[in-house]
Swiss-Prot record:
Membrane topology: Multi-pass membrane protein
Main location: membrane
PANTHER family: FLUORIDE EXPORT PROTEIN 1-RELATED (PTHR28259:SF1)
Organism, scientific name: Campylobacter fetus subsp. fetus (strain 82-40)
GO biological process: cellular detoxification of fluoride
Similarity comment: family membership: Belongs to the fluoride channel Fluc/FEX (TC 1.A.43) family.
Keywords: Cell inner membrane, Cell membrane, Ion channel, Ion transport, Membrane, Metal-binding, Sodium, Transmembrane, Transmembrane helix, Transport
A single Gene Ontology CC term: plasma membrane
UniProt cross-references to InterPro entries, sorted A to Z: FluC
Designated name of the protein: Fluoride-specific ion channel FluC
Localization: Cell inner membrane
Main function: Fluoride-specific ion channel. Important for reducing fluoride concentration in the cell, thus reducing its toxicity.
Domain of life of the source: Bacteria
GO molecular function, one term: metal ion binding
């Protein structure tokens, strides 16, 4: 892997992490009393959609390796988060909020996968 590719991954990751932080803050301001990690769910659904879209697009057109690395590995890797998802569920379980923990786990898995497929499907329709 070239230094240039590593740079693009790092730069994309930084931007994705910044957007994740802004998204979490924005969602917290809209729903200040919500005891559900909606910000993390939001970024994981958005990331699921865009990785499906971009990977499907990459199978139909030639995307520069640095651009793909920036967008997929860097930006979407920084935007989405499994570690925060895990931590938030641990907190929900420790506080006895089993319903929200279950809903959060199911929502993240099912909706992220559904939106990933939706992004993939959009490109499939575009190139049919």
């Amino acid at each position: 892997m070239s230094f240039t590719t590593i740079f693009y991954i790092g730069f994309g990751g930084a931007l994705g992490a910044i957007l994740r932080s802004f998204t979490n803050g924005f969602v917290s301001k809209i729903f200040p009393n919500l005891s559900f990690p909606l910000g993390t769910l939001s970024v994981n659904i958005i990331g699921g959609f865009f990785i499906g879209f971009l990977m499907s697009l990459a199978s139909n057109i030639n995307i520069d390796i640095n651009l793909k690395s920036f967008l997929v590995t860097g930006f979407l890797g920084g935007l989405t988060t499994f570690s925060t998802f895990s931590y938030e569920n641990m907190l929900l379980l420790q506080s006895g909020n089993y319903t929200n923990a279950f809903l959060n786990i199911a929502s993240n898995l099912l909706l992220s996968l559904l939106f990933c497929y939706f992004g993939f499907w959009i490109v499939k329709v575009m190139y049919a």
